[in-house]
Curated annotation (Swiss-Prot):
This is Protein MC132. Keywords: Host cytoplasm, Host-virus interaction, Inhibition of host NF-kappa-B by virus. Inhibits host NF-kappa-B activation stimulated by IL-1 and multiple PRR viral detection pathways. Targets host NF-kappa-B component RELA/p65 for ubiquitin-dependent proteasomal degradation. GO terms for biological process: symbiont-mediated suppression of host NF-kappaB cascade. The keyword Cell wall biogenesis/degradation does not apply. It comes from Molluscum contagiosum virus subtype 1. Its main location: host cell. One of its GO terms (cellular component) is host cell cytoplasm.
Length: 229
């Protein structure tokens, strides 16, 4: 099995033993809020991991470094999985950090936060018509690999800019964002503010293997569940 070549580096603050505990308290400050989040996640197909967490790098087999090159946050034209499926991916990330509690080992720590960040970035691009040209092959997909300074975390097209836009920009729909999406934005913002300055130069989508093991991704069912939450 090949290790992922470009893991995200959580900042040094994550070395504190109570990092995930404090993070959970900031996002879900009361037991009732945490219980509600757990119920919402379970309704959308998330289950607490038993033993090895399914979002840990060791759970994914890589035949070569660029195996999942085009399955990530900027898929090719006509291959976008749909916003409902992306929200499910984001909810899996929320469940991972709040309930699976990755063990803190080593310094610096390596965790694949690209899952959550890429999901937010994809949702942002998906709902903004002004970014439609970025989906075309030859633009963002190809240039991303040859212009890392522009498409890296701190570049003008990087995740930092997109995530900030998602957090501070106007919501384009008449109804407010779902509770789940607000939780995800909050936890991602907290990670940024608490030391994730080294986060993700690359945004390879590493949950492709995860989705192959969980094929139940009906857009209609997901939409119904999201409307009920």
């Amino acid at each position: 099995m090949m290790n992922f070549s470009d893991p995200c580096l959580l900042g040094p603050s994550a070395c504190n033993e109570d990092f995930f505990e404090e993070l959970a308290r900031e996002i879900l400050p009361t037991p009732e809020a945490k219980a509600l989040a757990a119920r919402l996640l379970r309704r959308l197909g998330w289950h607490p991991s038993e033993g090895q967490c399914s979002w840990c790098p060791e759970a994914y087999e890589y035949l070569y470094d660029l195996q999942f090159r085009y399955t990530g946050p900027v898929p090719l034209v006509r291959k976008h999985p749909g916003s409902a499926l992306i929200v499910r991916w984001m909810l899996d990330g929320l469940g991972h950090f709040l309930f699976c509690r990755p063990r803190v080992q080593g310094n610096p720590l390596t965790y694949h936060l690209s899952c959550m960040g890429s999901a937010i970035r994809t949702l942002e691009l998906f709902r903004e018509q002004a970014h439609s040209h970025l989906w075309e092959q030859g633009n963002l997909v190809d240039c991303y690999w040859s212009c890392s300074s522009d498409y890296g975390y701190e570049g003008k097209w990087g995740q930092q800019a997109v995530v900030r836009g998602a957090l501070s920009g106007p919501w384009p729909r008449p109804d407010p964002p779902s509770l789940q999406l607000q939780c995800l934005c909050a936890i991602w913002r907290t990670c940024l503010l608490r030391g994730q300055s080294q986060a993700q130069k690359y945004t390879n989508w590493i949950c492709a293997r995860h989705l192959q093991l969980r094929p139940d991704t009906s857009t209609r069912d997901s939409d119904l569940l999201l409307q009920r939450c």
